[in-house]
Amino acid sequence: MTTAIVEGSVQAVAQASGQSIAESFVMCDVIVIVDTSGSMAQRDSRGEKSRYEVACEDLEAIQKSMPGRVAVISFSDEVEFCPGGIPVYKGGSTDLAKALRFAKMADVSGCRFILISDGEPDKPEEAMSVAKTYTARIDVVYVGPEANPIGRFYLEKLAKASSGTTVTSDRASDLLSTVTKLLGNGDSV
């Protein structure tokens, strides 16, 4: 996937308005936390693309439709803020607890969180503990296989812990419409 700056991303809006990336980030009301671990390379999504590739395509469309409102954070072994809008595929493990601790800084009134993942984190109890500290809801888009009920059930439990909703997106085939539905067509969060 390209490292180009996505239209509508935090970085694009900052450049267009003469603001710093930090100033643009604080205007975001949606934080999308994207799993970039090894399993996201599975090529079982639309057009035989990987879950990661489809997630990136749809993230681009979401940011274009909601300019300056969506910040992207990626995670695998490490966590990274992605001001340009597209996470770099990292492979590796699934350190969701670390990602939730990182994103916690944005847990303020009016902010929404959407977690896009395909399975179980490395430290499920730790991730659940962090999720329970959130005041904002964490909605989950499960993009893994239906044949993995353990991963899906865990993510459902995590969403419920923060009063969030879980949606299964058929192996990332309809991620854009799923996220748009969770956000109420992008009009308000």
Where do the protein language model's features map onto the residues?
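Short beta-strand-loop
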Residues: D44, A61-A106, P124-S129, G151-K157
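DG-centered beta-turn motif at the end of beta-strands
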Residues: V34-S37, A55, V72, G110-M128, ...
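VWA/integrin I-like adhesion module and closely mimicked acidic/polar interface patches used
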Residues: P87-T94, G119-A161, V167-S169, S177-T180
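A charged, well-structured terminal subsegment
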Residues: S173-S188
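Residues at the starts of beta-strands that form the adenosine-phosphate
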Residues: D29, R69-A71, R112, R137-D139
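Conserved phosphate-coordination/catalytic loops
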Residues: Q11, K49, E53, K90-A97, ...
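…and closely analogous acidic/polar surface helices at protein-protein or active-site interfaces
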Residues: V26-V30, G38-V70, V88-K90
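Acidic, polar low-complexity linker/tail segments
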Residues: M1-V32, T36-E48, S188-V189
